[in-house]
Amino acid sequence: MQQKREGKTIMEIRKITGVVPADKRAVEAAFDSIEPQPVACCNWPEQYPYAPEVSFRMFHTGAYLMLRFDVAERWTMARVTEDNGEVWTDSCVEFFIAPDDSGYYYNFECTCIGRLLVGFRREREHATHATPRVMESILRNPSLGPRPFPEHKGDRK
């Protein structure tokens, strides 16, 4: 799934045809056929030593990029109610993808209830955020449902 090319790690995304996002069984079967990739990164270990267990699976259909995160954590919170809001204040995952070598990339941050912050950028600052129309086109299926909730303690997936 990953390879090194010119000092960069390149991930090849598997193509699975015939999967329609509305067919949840087919989507889950496709995800189940893909080996989970661990996310073994804690960006600020001095400030936040706890890191949840996180892995992801990804494929594309030619028309859709399909991404699933599996997260197990001790505390879960989902208070942000709008897209392009402060999703980083909730339990969330982050995904970066650079479709070419231009130096620009997309940054997706998604809460455990499916609220998204999407940016297109070349550097950390100065992001161009997705429009409401683009946000509406991104299909989501959060396992914890779409409704906000206060912090919960206990294992949640």
Residue ranges and their predicted role:
Residues K4-K157:
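Structural preference for beta-rich elements and adjacent junctions enriched in aromatics
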